[in-house]
């Protein structure tokens, strides 16, 4: 005959087993250590540190023996890696916008380099693709620096045209 104390005891065991069933998969899925760090020049693959692949290549297959290099493969055309890495794919090469000229083509080890076309400059250094038309100095104001692909025109703040001096002189006389 099952008494109330037996049922109570069984429910405690059932509850304990239920909790274990819920938390054991979470516990075993956690990495062994949150501070698992590989030395410089290596990357983590599963629980093993592997030596990085050189620039221009990517990891086709990770190492099986710790601190050795896995299988590296050369980047495919149109892709690159600019430094030693543990990437599983190379990065896609960027494209130049319609208002830019290509300065250097993409290679396995470097991205394509673009610059603004003549008459345009980079408006925002954080976004090099943002080319804007160069400013033209007002008539009679000297140019201190010509516009180029990385900087806008710099105009002098002084007036050098004799007509402008005459205008300023007349303005002063009228004010007095």
Swiss-Prot record:
Query: Which residues of this chain are annotated as glycosylation sites?
Result: 148
Q: Name one GO cellular component term.
A: external side of plasma membrane
Alphabetically list the UniProt keywords.
Cell membrane, Disulfide bond, Glycoprotein, GPI-anchor, Lipoprotein, Membrane, Receptor, Repeat, Signal
Topological type in the membrane: Lipid-anchor; GPI-anchor
The record ties this protein, via Pfam families, to:
TNFR_c6 (PF00020)
Chain residues in the propeptide: 156-176
* GO BP term, example: negative regulation of extrinsic apoptotic signaling pathway via death domain receptors
Is-annotated flag, keyword Nucleotide-binding? no
Positions with an attached lipid (GPI-anchor amidated cysteine) read 155
Intracellular or extracellular location(s) = Cell membrane
Q: What does UniProt give as the signal peptide span?
A: 1-29
List the SUPFAM superfamilies hit by this protein, alphabetically. TNF receptor-like (SSF57586)
Q: What is the first-listed, main subcellular location in coarse terms?
A: membrane
Gene3D superfamilies per record: Tumor Necrosis Factor Receptor, subunit A, domain 2 (2.10.50.10)
Coiled-coil annotation: which residues?
none
Report where it is expressed, by tissue.
Ubiquitous.
Instruction: Provide the disulphide bond pattern.
Output: 38-49, 50-63, 53-72, 75-90, 93-106, 96-114, 116-131, 134-147, 137-155
Q: Where are the TNFR-Cys repeats?
A: 37-72, 74-114, 115-155
Instruction: Provide the function of this protein.
Output: Receptor for the cytotoxic ligand TRAIL. Lacks a cytoplasmic death domain and hence is not capable of inducing apoptosis. May protect cells against TRAIL mediated apoptosis through ligand competition. Cannot induce the NF-kappa-B pathway.
Record's protein name: Tumor necrosis factor receptor superfamily member 23
Source organism of this protein record: Mus musculus
Q: Which gene encodes it?
A: Tnfrsf23
């Amino acid at each position: 005959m099952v008494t109330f104390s037996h049922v109570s005891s069984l429910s405690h065991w059932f509850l304990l087993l239920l909790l274990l069933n819920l938390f054991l998969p979470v516990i075993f899925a956690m990495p062994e250590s949150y501070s698992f760090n590989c030395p410089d020049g290596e990357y983590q693959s599963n629980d093993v540190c592997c030596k990085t692949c050189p620039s221009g290549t990517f990891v086709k297959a990770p190492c099986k023996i710790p601190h050795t290099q896995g299988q590296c493969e050369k980047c495919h055309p149109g892709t690159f890696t600019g430094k030693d890495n543990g990437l599983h794919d190379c990065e896609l090469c960027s494209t130049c916008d319609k208002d830019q000229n290509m300065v250097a083509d993409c290679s396995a080890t470097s991205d394509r380099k673009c610059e603004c076309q003549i008459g345009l400059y980079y408006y925002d250094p954080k976004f090099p693709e943002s080319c804007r038309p160069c400013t033209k100095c007002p008539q009679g104001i000297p140019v201190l620096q010509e516009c180029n692909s990385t900087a806008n025109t710099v105009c002098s703040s002084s007036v050098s045209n004799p007509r402008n001096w005459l205008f300023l002189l007349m303005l002063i006389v009228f004010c007095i």
